[in-house]
């Protein structure tokens, strides 16, 4: 199975399954002499881990990361950093009923058709549990970016189902209340929307159903010049990284699809000696960072793991009914904010190292 790595100079390779012994990753390209310990990685993992609120899956995992290599006397050595997280709260018996069934909307069918075998326990490798290692690796990237270049990467949830935040709460990046974002389980900057999200999720849990979400991730203080046209454009690599997150079905950079209804006189980011007058492009022009904040939005589908019965087939292509009995999130977007931050950090650091190697 290929496709387990991302990045060129800053390269992350993950391994492990949802109900396996452990999850792990190898992080190559971390510059030497950066102070690093598990305590630097754990806060982001705690933001992502399951069982932290009544709005997410009841599966409880400590997600305590251990650094296996690449750090000596509290500093990175420049060699590969090995990370591991032990799985602890697997309940594989919950998946006995779907051993030979394909859950509609999941990767069960395609994995079976491609490989002729699949780990049906919690989705195996296709489970979002794998993203814990992305968050751990991303925390390394975020730390280096902030300490060495002042780059800060943060995200927030802007929509669950048809419930949207007040756009005025995020109209100006400098005025986003990040304390509010970090003080509620939805990572939401709008306190009114938090109450509406709460009500919506409660109803969905009663129904045994799920819902989709939209979130935004922003990188501030990114220097001008990151990105390698034409095929390694910064926005192309960001889209690739963000689309690789489980359940993501759409990515927008800047105004994204809203640009369809804009005129050129509106969408172009005019400039003055003092700087740009707008940021419709999301901080990227011609595939290269412009020095403005990089803004990306992602849409996540509603999880297909629900207790509402659904039609499907089994491995013998016979019709069956599927009812998911495992523990799942009613809205996967709630825990996706730190994952999106991690993927943006991995891409930005990779391109920053490539920029330094080529241009300065």
UniProtKB/Swiss-Prot annotation:
UniProt cross-references to Pfam families, sorted A to Z: Chorismate_synt
Binding site for FMN: 125-127, 246-247, 286, 301-305, 327
Reactions it catalyzes: 5-O-(1-carboxyvinyl)-3-phosphoshikimate = chorismate + phosphate
Presence of the UniProt keyword Methyltransferase in the record: no
Cofactor: how bound: Reduced FMN (FMNH(2)).
Stored InterPro entries: Chorismate_synth (IPR000453), Chorismate_synth_AroC_sf (IPR035904), Chorismate_synthase_CS (IPR020541)
One example of a Gene Ontology biological process annotation: amino acid biosynthetic process
Listed EC numbers: 4.2.3.5
CDD domains: Chorismate_synthase
Binding site for NADP(+): 48, 54
PROSITE patterns: CHORISMATE_SYNTHASE_1 (PS00787), CHORISMATE_SYNTHASE_2 (PS00788), CHORISMATE_SYNTHASE_3 (PS00789)
Residue spans crossing the bilayer: none
Broadest EC class assigned to this enzyme: lyase
GO annotations of cellular component type: cytosol
Keywords for this protein: Amino-acid biosynthesis, Aromatic amino acid biosynthesis, FAD, Flavoprotein, FMN, Lyase, NADP
Pathway noted in the entry: Metabolic intermediate biosynthesis; chorismate biosynthesis; chorismate from D-erythrose 4-phosphate and phosphoenolpyruvate: step 7/7
Subunit-level organization: Homotetramer.
Function according to Swiss-Prot or TrEMBL: This reaction introduces a second double bond into the aromatic ring system.
Family designation: Belongs to the chorismate synthase family.
Protein's name in the database: Chorismate synthase
Organism lineage: Bacteria, Pseudomonadati, Pseudomonadota, Gammaproteobacteria, Pasteurellales
